[in-house]
Amino acid sequence: MEKRWWKESIVYQIYPRSFKDSNGDGIGDLNGITEKMDYLKKLGVNVVWLSPVYQSPNDDNGYDISDYRAIMTEFGTMEDFDRMLAAAHEHGIKIVMDLVVNHTSDEHPWFIESRKSKDNPYRDYYIWRDGKDGKEPNNWGSCFSGPAWDYDEETDMYYLHLFSKKQPDLNWDNPKVREEVFDMMNWWLEKGVDGFRMDVISLISKQPDLPDGKPGINGYASFNEPANGPHVHEYLQEMREKVLNNADTITVGECSGVTLEEAKKYARSDEKELNMVFQFEHMDVDADADNKWTDKKMDLREMKAVLTKWQKGLEDIAWNSLFWENHDQPRSVSRYADDSAKYHDVSAKMLATCIHMMQGTPYVYQGEELGMTNVPFTSIDQFRDLDSINAYRELVEEQHVFTAEEMMRYLCCKSRDNARTPFQWDDSAYAGFSTVEPWIMVNPNYKEINAKKQIDDPESVFNYYRKLIALRKEKEIIVYGTYDLLLPESEEIYMYIRTLGEEKLLVVCNFSEKEVAVEIPEEFRKGSYLIANYPKGEIKEQMTIRPYEAFVLEK
């Protein structure tokens, strides 16, 4: 397998609004990131993926961009960005920009022009259609509730928005749109950024006839209906030729709804398109078929089957991204393990062991390395996330699918705002994130869970992450070894083997609070511990795996 720097990297995702406020306005900013570069260096990560910092009206927290070559005023200036970029590079950290080009803001100059008239030069930059029988052109739903179409009186037509009404979809079939996007990407590369995380990139090519899809719980087809459209690979290959080959970049595509076969096309080892994709099949293990709003717990057997499918399916063909968390997902220690005081630390370390020992590039979301947890929200008024607020309005107030109590329970489990509360730096007011009340509430457990408390504690979750990250840099087998699952039918234990030549590692993780007896494969019984989240027991044929225990044995 060809060795590449991005296969050996550890990526840290920063959600700037919630990372560090440097100027006392309650909102995180670029200077706050620059201020904390030493922290990132200490953790050991070598790439930072920055959620959008471009000019935006902030309908969807920066994923609605009105100017791709300007910085959102709340986050600072272009000079602040340049200073942050230089500081990152001085610390040996690369910067990856969030590229949001499936859609723009409705306040982008292109859309302002596009909606003026049917013959405007920018009309075809977006997807406009006539209505059908006085209704929307098809039954596609928006990711944020309601239809994916909005009627525009000015020209008596509908425009497509797979996300909010303020996020109209670009028409990638128009070569001028592609040229504009490629030109903008080259501009950022010339500035010195090191790559792109491509937001919902699998949605950019729509089927020309925009066919209806299967309706879900709210009567609309999924926003994912256009995923992996007819020209998506052609457009990404064009992007590779016109942009990505101009520099030694790292690229990852967010590919919601992607199949294994499609992923092989997006992230083939011949590097014609992207380096890797984010697939979300493992994020759907605890969802209902047609509804994500649930408090259903995952079945570990299904989780193992999904992750194993991707580990084996991409082996020697394409490259995996490894993650439990991002800005759109709840906190993993609350979701997949146990965030109670008794098991919090071992749970967070177990989850980290499980995912970081697989083949692929690991992504750590801010606060994950501390074991930050879901938030005990008590009222819909505490939420800031468009998705959560719209879903509450639609499913509770309008359609009465759920009661208010049910929906609050589901939001506390699944809302994106669980990941977006301020980073917990210390136990001072507002968790050391800001000197004033932040834009969203601070998780009340910040006095127990914070960076200051963990950095100097050798047994902390933070220092366990440091060890995992250091091991990945030191041991080629963790990056390049093959993966083989053991005990597929166990409901508690996730156990797998990594192999590279004569080297072998055994990874054992208990996803339950039970003590579980496990037989250790013979070849590891005379081995040694590489890492463990409990005091190390004697390695023998039969071992009792303690609640949320994780360890790695080296042959």
What spans do the regions from the language model cover?
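Active-site and adjacent substrate-binding regions of carbohydrate-active enzymes
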Residues: 1-528, 532-555
